[in-house]
């Protein structure tokens, strides 16, 4: 079975527990924290995938490192260790966020711009794209892309809204080529 399918199953199980306990936000924050630690620390990943280190040692280590997370998240980490699936943790976190966003009718947007946007600009973009997408809210993450000449590009899910100067120039060029 592919890692994506397995990750989705774990995410769905966590999502059901979170809904039952009314802790969608808390689980999301904890999963993002754990995901962040895993992706930024290659030594942690190496330690947890080392076959000569016992599962109990790995679990004790996880309990110490992630003492602040809920029992459900910690137990999920233990199960991943037992099933030798700890490497799919980032995918599980991403799948969980998708499920939680769907439940709350929220979307995550990555906004590419030539400079950091102010909070007011982020808010305006979030409001405009919430209306455009039919979502209750949009959470904006700003990424500076110095290759843009001007304007912004917004990525929500697998859709890209290109309001950059480069995008406009490319559309004009296509239009001119089409009319030849």
Curated annotation (Swiss-Prot):
GO molecular function: proton-transporting ATP synthase activity, rotational mechanism
Disulfide bonds: none
Cellular component GO terms held in the UniProt record: plasma membrane; proton-transporting ATP synthase complex
Entry keyword annotation includes Ion transport: yes
Chief location bin: membrane
Function: F(1)F(0) ATP synthase produces ATP from ADP in the presence of a proton or sodium gradient. F-type ATPases consist of two structural domains, F(1) containing the extramembraneous catalytic core and F(0) containing the membrane proton channel, linked together by a central stalk and a peripheral stalk. During catalysis, ATP synthesis in the catalytic domain of F(1) is coupled via a rotary mechanism of the central stalk subunits to proton translocation.
UniProt family annotation: Belongs to the ATPase delta chain family.
Record's protein name: ATP synthase subunit delta
Organism: Bacillus mycoides (strain KBAB4)
Gene that encodes it: atpH
């Amino acid at each position: 079975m592919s890692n994506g399918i397995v990750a989705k199953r774990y995410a769905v199980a966590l999502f059901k527990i979170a809904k039952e306990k009314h802790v969608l936000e808390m689980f999301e924050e904890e999963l993002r924290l754990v995901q962040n630690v895993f992706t930024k620390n290659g030594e942690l990943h190496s330690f947890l995938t080392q076959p000569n280190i016992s599962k109990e040692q790995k679990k004790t280590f996880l309990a110490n490192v992630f003492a602040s997370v809920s029992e459900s998240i910690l137990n999920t980490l233990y199960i991943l260790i037992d099933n030798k699936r700890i490497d799919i943790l980032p995918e599980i976190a991403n799948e969980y966020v998708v499920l939680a966003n769907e439940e709350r009718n929220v979307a995550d947007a990555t906004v590419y711009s030539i400079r950091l946007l102010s909070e007011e600009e982020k808010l305006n973009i979030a409001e405009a794209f919430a209306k455009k997408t039919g979502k209750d809210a949009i959470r904006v993450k700003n990424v500076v892309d110095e290759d843009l000449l001007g304007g912004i590009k917004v990525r929500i899910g697998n859709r890209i809204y290109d309001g950059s100067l480069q995008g406009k120039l490319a559309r004009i060029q296509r239009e001119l080529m089409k009319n030849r």
